[in-house]
């Protein structure tokens, strides 16, 4: 049996990479959960309230504007790049991310191998007709008018992220579950594994006997499970990129 992360990566050919906010904190984007996470100090706006009340829509857009202005220029880091190197080696079955920051795409992860299970903040989406577009114009409208931007059809525009109380997209879940059923290694990176149903995706593979590796500095909801093969509490940026480079024998 492999003894360390490098050996697990080197011996696998269909890796399911499941990522959470911890992979983007080195890029300056704060985590939502865990110690000091956004949801420890801020109450989220639920989707039903967004659709029902203008005050909730304004609160939501104000929060998203603050995030956009503070973190909209964030760039991928060595963790995102290491995942791209894994893909280029032909070892990635799917990258399933809970993150909405778009950094996997920016790093070069292929669209066909990426599931943004909680949506993306890189686009806005009409809640009536489903039209999607880049968000800059909507942020300018909100800054100027102080109210929720509208689509040409009259529907409410909202960043294309999945809000609390909003259903995940069935196609995204199906792609993620399909990869979990066919992979030969699960890497859970930077996630507290506390949000359902997304946290069930790596467990589908683990319960079928696929090796399950978790790397996260904080505790996760899966730490106690017998299916966990390797658990590392190290900083991701310190251990994951070097392990990938060694497994793939990349030049420094």
Locations of regions flagged by a protein language model:
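Conserved catalytic core of sirtuin-type NAD+-dependent deacylases
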Residues: 1-252
């Amino acid at each position: 049996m492999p003894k360390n992360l490098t050996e697990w990566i080197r011996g696998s050919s269909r890796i399911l990479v499941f990522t959470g906010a911890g992979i983007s904190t080195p890029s300056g984007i704060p985590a939502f959960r865990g110690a000091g996470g956004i949801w420890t100090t801020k109450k989220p706006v639920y989707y039903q309230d967004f659709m029902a009340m203008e005050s909730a829509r304004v609160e939501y857009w104000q929060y998203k504007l603050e995030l956009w202005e503070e973190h909209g220029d964030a760039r991928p880091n060595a963790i995102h790049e290491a995942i791209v190197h894994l893909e280029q080696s032909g070892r990635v079955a799917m990258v399933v991310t809970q993150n909405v920051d778009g950094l996997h795409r920016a790093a070069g992860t292929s669209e066909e191998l990426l599931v943004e299970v909680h949506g993306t903040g890189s686009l806005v989406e009409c809640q009536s007709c489903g039209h999607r577009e880049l968000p800059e114009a909507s942020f300018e409208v909100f800054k100027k008018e102080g109210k929720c931007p509208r689509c040409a059809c009259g529907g409410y525009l909202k960043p294309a992220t999945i809000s609390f109380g909003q259903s995940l997209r069935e196609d995204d879940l199906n792609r993620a579950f399909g990869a979990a059923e066919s992979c030969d290694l699960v890497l859970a990176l930077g996630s507290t594994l506390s949000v359902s149903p997304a946290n069930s995706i790596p467990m589908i593979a683990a319960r079928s006997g696929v090796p399950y590796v978790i790397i996260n500095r904080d505790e996760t909801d899966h730490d106690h499970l017998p299916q966990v093969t390797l658990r590392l509490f190290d900083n991701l940026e310190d251990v994951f990129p070097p392990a990938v480079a060694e497994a793939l024998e990349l030049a420094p």
